[in-house]
């Protein structure tokens, strides 16, 4: 990804010296002040990407295999898995090419590396945007299924879901291409930050509303069965904990990356901001961690999908 404060990884590898052993420690910024820099080992970066790649390939394969999973909800989950797969795969490819260039095992002209870097950047950026969009689409789908349960199948149809998916992919590719072309414009970075905040607010509002409705429903049942008041309280706490984990993971994994973009606009030369810029690879690693967690939250909790996945794994042996 083209970001201020850190050179492009592939192009920098052409003339780079062997890097020091990755570490967690204090590094000096431009003003001589000390700041915390977390270096992500390439082996860890590749390992996280591989785990995410395998997980999301399994999700896509299971949904494609089982016709019972060909519904709008699983369509969005499948596309989320595909987006996460591309996020992990593109970052793995960039890391692998960088290591080969640094080791001298791969010879390439600067122009070729520039083009490859641009392609990887577009894939990475578009898959990030689409991943955020599909997280929002899943939240909207679940909201409609709860608040418009009787009309759900007439509102959320498979053709409409497919059109939404196509629109998300096209918009993601176009926006990412513009971002790569005009990454040095503050307006572009601010648009990305606003988009992330919009997705965060959308998910928070929808899931909090769904939790409130579920608690009201449980409270109504508890009134009919007075003995179940403790169970109702436990349900509310469990729902709040689940919501906190879901939104917390989303913010923890995606927030640092968009904070990075925000600081590029607000304080590109400030010493403190420069310290944060040094941890860009850590922020990418957190996004890959989110790609690992997404299948656990949205896919593997489905009994039907787990059963299909088991069949796929048994057949592969």
Swiss-Prot record:
<dbReference type="InterPro" id="IPR001671">
    <property type="entry name" value="Melcrt_ACTH_rcpt"/>
</dbReference>
<feature type="topological domain" description="Cytoplasmic">
    <location>
        <begin position="141"/>
        <end position="163"/>
    </location>
</feature>
<feature type="topological domain" description="Cytoplasmic">
    <location>
        <begin position="212"/>
        <end position="240"/>
    </location>
</feature>
<feature type="lipid moiety-binding region" description="S-palmitoyl cysteine">
    <location>
        <position position="315"/>
    </location>
</feature>
<dbReference type="Pfam" id="PF00001">
    <property type="entry name" value="7tm_1"/>
</dbReference>
<feature type="transmembrane region" description="Helical; Name=7">
    <location>
        <begin position="280"/>
        <end position="300"/>
    </location>
</feature>
<dbReference type="GO" id="GO:0007189">
    <property type="term" value="P:adenylate cyclase-activating G protein-coupled receptor signaling pathway"/>
</dbReference>
<feature type="transmembrane region" description="Helical; Name=6">
    <location>
        <begin position="241"/>
        <end position="266"/>
    </location>
</feature>
<keyword id="KW-0325">Glycoprotein</keyword>
<comment type="subunit">
    <text>Interacts with MGRN1, but does not undergo MGRN1-mediated ubiquitination; this interaction competes with GNAS-binding and thus inhibits agonist-induced cAMP production. Interacts with OPN3; the interaction results in a decrease in MC1R-mediated cAMP signaling and ultimately a decrease in melanin production in melanocytes.</text>
</comment>
<keyword id="KW-0812">Transmembrane</keyword>
<keyword id="KW-0564">Palmitate</keyword>
<feature type="topological domain" description="Extracellular">
    <location>
        <begin position="184"/>
        <end position="191"/>
    </location>
</feature>
<keyword id="KW-1003">Cell membrane</keyword>
<feature type="transmembrane region" description="Helical; Name=5">
    <location>
        <begin position="192"/>
        <end position="211"/>
    </location>
</feature>
<keyword id="KW-0297">G-protein coupled receptor</keyword>
<feature type="transmembrane region" description="Helical; Name=1">
    <location>
        <begin position="38"/>
        <end position="63"/>
    </location>
</feature>
<feature type="glycosylation site" description="N-linked (GlcNAc...) asparagine">
    <location>
        <position position="29"/>
    </location>
</feature>
<keyword id="KW-1133">Transmembrane helix</keyword>
<feature type="topological domain" description="Extracellular">
    <location>
        <begin position="94"/>
        <end position="118"/>
    </location>
</feature>
<dbReference type="InterPro" id="IPR000761">
    <property type="entry name" value="MSH_rcpt"/>
</dbReference>
<keyword id="KW-0472">Membrane</keyword>
<feature type="topological domain" description="Cytoplasmic">
    <location>
        <begin position="301"/>
        <end position="317"/>
    </location>
</feature>
<feature type="transmembrane region" description="Helical; Name=2">
    <location>
        <begin position="73"/>
        <end position="93"/>
    </location>
</feature>
<feature type="transmembrane region" description="Helical; Name=3">
    <location>
        <begin position="119"/>
        <end position="140"/>
    </location>
</feature>
<protein>
    <recommendedName>
        <fullName>Melanocyte-stimulating hormone receptor</fullName>
    </recommendedName>
</protein>
<feature type="transmembrane region" description="Helical; Name=4">
    <location>
        <begin position="164"/>
        <end position="183"/>
    </location>
</feature>
<dbReference type="InterPro" id="IPR017452">
    <property type="entry name" value="GPCR_Rhodpsn_7TM"/>
</dbReference>
<feature type="topological domain" description="Cytoplasmic">
    <location>
        <begin position="64"/>
        <end position="72"/>
    </location>
</feature>
<keyword id="KW-0807">Transducer</keyword>
<dbReference type="GO" id="GO:0004980">
    <property type="term" value="F:melanocyte-stimulating hormone receptor activity"/>
</dbReference>
<comment type="function">
    <text>Receptor for MSH (alpha, beta and gamma) and ACTH. The activity of this receptor is mediated by G proteins which activate adenylate cyclase. Mediates melanogenesis, the production of eumelanin (black/brown) and phaeomelanin (red/yellow), via regulation of cAMP signaling in melanocytes.</text>
</comment>
<keyword id="KW-0675">Receptor</keyword>
<feature type="topological domain" description="Extracellular">
    <location>
        <begin position="267"/>
        <end position="279"/>
    </location>
</feature>
<keyword id="KW-0449">Lipoprotein</keyword>
<dbReference type="InterPro" id="IPR000276">
    <property type="entry name" value="GPCR_Rhodpsn"/>
</dbReference>
<feature type="topological domain" description="Extracellular">
    <location>
        <begin position="1"/>
        <end position="37"/>
    </location>
</feature>
<dbReference type="GO" id="GO:0005886">
    <property type="term" value="C:plasma membrane"/>
</dbReference>
<comment type="similarity">
    <text>Belongs to the G-protein coupled receptor 1 family.</text>
</comment>
């Amino acid at each position: 990804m083209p970001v201020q404060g850190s050179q492009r990884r592939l192009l920098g590898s052409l003339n780079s010296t062997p890097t020091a052993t990755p570490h967690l420690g204090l590094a000096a910024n431009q003003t001589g002040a000390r700041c915390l820099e977390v270096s992500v080992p390439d082996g860890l970066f590749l390992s996280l990407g591989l785990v995410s790649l395998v997980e999301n390939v399994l999700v896509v394969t299971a949904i494609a295999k089982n016709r019972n999973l060909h519904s709008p909800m699983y369509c969005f989950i499948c596309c989320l898995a595909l987006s996460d797969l591309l996020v992990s795969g593109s970052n793995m490819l960039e890391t692998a090419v960088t290591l080969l260039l640094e080791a001298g095992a791969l010879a390439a002209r600067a122009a070729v590396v520039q083009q490859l870097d641009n392609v990887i950047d577009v894939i990475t950026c578009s898959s990030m945007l689409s991943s955020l969009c599909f997280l929002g689409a899943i939240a909207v789908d679940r909201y409609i299924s709860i608040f418009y349960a009787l009309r759900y199948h007439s509102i959320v149809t498979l053709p409409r879901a497919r059109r939404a998916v196509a629109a998300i992919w096209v918009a993601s590719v176009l926006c990412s291409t513009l971002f790569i072309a005009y990454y040095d414009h503050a307006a572009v970075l601010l648009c990305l930050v606003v988009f992330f905040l919009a997705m965060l607010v959308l998910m928070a509002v929808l899931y909090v509303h769904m939790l409130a409705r579920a608690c009201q429903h449980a409270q109504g049942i508890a009134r009919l069965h007075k003995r179940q008041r403790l169970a109702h309280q436990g349900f509310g706490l469990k729902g709040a904990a689940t919501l906190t984990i879901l939104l917390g993971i989303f913010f923890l994994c995606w927030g640092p990356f968009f904070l990075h973009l925000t600081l590029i606009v607000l304080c590109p030369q400030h010493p403190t901001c420069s310290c944060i810029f040094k941890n860009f690879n850590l922020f990418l690693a957190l996004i890959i961690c989110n790609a690992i967690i997404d299948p656990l939250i949205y896919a593997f909790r489905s009994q039907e999908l787990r059963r299909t996945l088991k069949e796929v794994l048994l057949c592969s042996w």
